[in-house]
Amino acid sequence: RAVTPRTKTIIPVDIAGFPCDYKSIMALVEEPEIKAMFAATSDVQQQLGRILVLSDSAHSIGAHYEGRRSGSETDIAVFSLHAVKNITTAEGGAICLNMPAPFDNDELYAKMRLTTLNCQTKDAFTKSKAGGWRYDIVGQGMKVNMADVNAAIGLAQIRQYDKLLAERKRVFLAYDKAFRNCSWAVTPPACTADKESSYHIYALRIKDITEEQRDAIIQEISKHEVAVNV
């Protein structure tokens, strides 16, 4: 019922690091009835011929879905590398391209990379080399490229991410053990037959409380220097 001819993109969100049911979502956009309803309004949409699935995987870097890392199940997946995420570059993100044929993902990547640096055909490092002064501006881009220092921070964390992820899992399971038998607690999913979380956030829910009671609980927890958010 939520899909109409105006629907161009579905954006599933991996809340707290637990992957969505991507097999069902991808099957939905391929259903003949849904594809027949799709009304393209651009050449790219016409070429795809169906609704695009772009996963908000900001929380789920390192999660697993059917034995594969998150980011590999949808047309496009976007990770966050913000300061509070499992892997950080202080600020920034990463985009995974899995567009189907006839799209060329390498070509799409090159276009996206070009756009992040004002559509300049050479980056600052390349321009500093002998003969590198000759370059062009080939379009209307943006200045959103990641600085080398930020990228270096991210690369260092990627190299030790398996260790970081194991520690997050340890903490998550400790919370789970503490709350599992509490009748008032709704604990978050972590691992099923086909999914495993990135253990980004322990999203605990408490049954039958008001907003005021929730806020009071958060204030009490904060007194113990434990960060809590809604």
Describe each PLM feature range.
Residues 1-89, 99-102:
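Active-site phosphate-binding strand-loop segment of PLP-dependent enzymes
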Residues 9-13, 18-26, 35-37, 64, ...:
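PLP-dependent aminotransferase class I/II
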Residues 2, 96, 178:
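Conserved catalytic core of Hanks-type protein kinase domains
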Residues 78-79, 87-88, 93-96, 144, ...:
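Short glycine- and hydrophobic/aromatic-rich loop-to-beta-strand nucleating segment
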Residues 72-75, 91, 155, 166:
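A broad detector of short, well-ordered amphipathic alpha-helices
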